Regions:
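Hydrophobic ligand-binding cavity/cleft-lining segments
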Residues: 1-60
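Beta-strand/loop substructures that line and gate deep hydrophobic ligand-binding cavities in soluble
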Residues: 97-159
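Glycine-rich portal/gate segments that line the openings of hydrophobic small-molecule binding cavities
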Residues: 39, 46-110
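A conserved amphipathic terminal alpha-helix motif
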Residues: 136-196
Length: 197
């Protein structure tokens, strides 16, 4: 690091969830097939979804999606997010599956642009379904109200998975075309921090 560069400081927000009746494999599948279920995940808060770079084009890492959502009582916002490698994760991962998401500025390059902040959803099988830890590495300056709104939104999303994901995942098992039903495994090697093939 050059003397003129400063290490980015983050302000973490962490939630733990128990997701009943949903397997880690279903959640893996969800991330690369979000266009099928984004609105079901948080029906009153998710407004729009589009892939800028879909995962069926070059794989999971590097795929970019743009969403509009509301985190009440905060106003609607647009987020541009890129799936990152577990190696990019700014915190130690503790569960066996992980999706690492970098939030990009609207004008950041698709490849190589430094994320503004990171979101990590890590999860593993539990006796009742899946246990998950959601960590938001937020840029400094978030108000207490904005942090609480994001935390509550995240909890509602996690509670939403059992409502739709097992049924949707099962329905899509008949579609064998990987362009339409994108296979996704986000289990990673704890030593190399690379996704398993």
């Amino acid at each position: 690091m050059k003397e003129t560069e400063t290490k980015k400081e983050y302000d973490p927000l962490v939630n733990y969830h128990e997701i009943l009746g949903v397997t880690p494999e279903m959640i893996d599948w969800f991330w690369d097939n979000m266009e099928k279920a984004y609105y079901l995940w948080a029906p009153d808060e998710h407004v729009s979804f589009v892939w800028e770079i879909p995962p069926n084009q070059n794989g999971h890492v590097g795929a970019i999606h743009i969403v509009r959502e509301v985190e009440p009582p905060m106003p609607e916002k647009t987020l541009r997010m890129r799936f990152e490698s577990p190696k990019a994760c700014p915190i130690p991962l503790i569960y066996s599956h992980a999706v690492v998401i970098g939030r990009l500025a609207p004008d950041a390059p698709a490849v190589g642009g430094e994320p503004i902040s990171y979101t990590m959803h890590e999860y593993e099988e539990s006796p009742t379904g899946t246990r998950m830890r959601s960590t938001y590495m937020l840029e400094k300056g978030w108000t207490d109200g904005a942090r609480e709104a994001l935390s509550n939104h995240n909890k509602r999303e996690s509670l939403g998975f059992p409502r739709f994901l097992p049924q949707l995942y099962q329905l899509y098992q008949v579609i064998k075309n990987p362009k339409l039903n994108v296979p996704c495994c986000l289990k990673y090697d704890s030593k190399t921090l690379e996704y398993n093939k």
